[in-house]
Amino acid sequence: MATSRRVSRVSSLIKREVSQMLLHEIKDDRVGTGMVSVTEVEVSGDLQHAKIFVSIYGSPEAKASTMAGLHSAAPFVRRELGQRMRLRRTPEVSFLEDRSLERGDKILNLLNNLPQAIATEDLEDDDSGLALD
């Protein structure tokens, strides 16, 4: 089993290389339909599996198309990683959609609307308090 420092280094190297491949080398038109960026790479402790989290901007159809293109490009990505990196075994690559940015945006919108909701609730409480007296 590899040390956590080595796993971290391999993870960052995979992230950099896959980002370069997305920009210049993956020719699948489906990958270009949405703006894609690699947000995180999780490598297993034995360096046999790599989960590549990607953030895709665009419509839901573009996201689905882009994910299909990435899944079909996974063998190419693995082969390229094997040629570029000096590892005994190249990790199996899987692409997963990272929705953390969408969740963060949703939470920010809720927090931004919170003062308005509290003010509306206070007004309703004041109105109902007058009716009871």
UniProtKB/Swiss-Prot annotation:
Binding partners and assembly: Monomer. Binds 30S ribosomal subunits, but not 50S ribosomal subunits or 70S ribosomes.
One of the GO biological process terms: ribosome biogenesis
PANTHER family with a match to the protein in the record: RIBOSOME-BINDING FACTOR A, CHLOROPLASTIC-RELATED (PTHR33515:SF1)
Function statement: One of several proteins that assist in the late maturation steps of the functional core of the 30S ribosomal subunit. Associates with free 30S ribosomal subunits (but not with 30S subunits that are part of 70S ribosomes or polysomes). Required for efficient processing of 16S rRNA. May interact with the 5'-terminal helix region of 16S rRNA.
Homology family: Belongs to the RbfA family.
Subcellular location: Cytoplasm
Gene Ontology molecular function terms on file: ribosomal small subunit binding
Name recorded for this polypeptide: Ribosome-binding factor A
Pfam families: RBFA (PF02033)
Alphabetical keyword list: Cytoplasm, Ribosome biogenesis
Broad class of the protein's primary localization: cytoplasm
The species this protein was found in: Synechocystis sp. (strain ATCC 27184 / PCC 6803 / Kazusa)
Record GO cellular component, one term: cytosol
Chain segments annotated as transmembrane: none
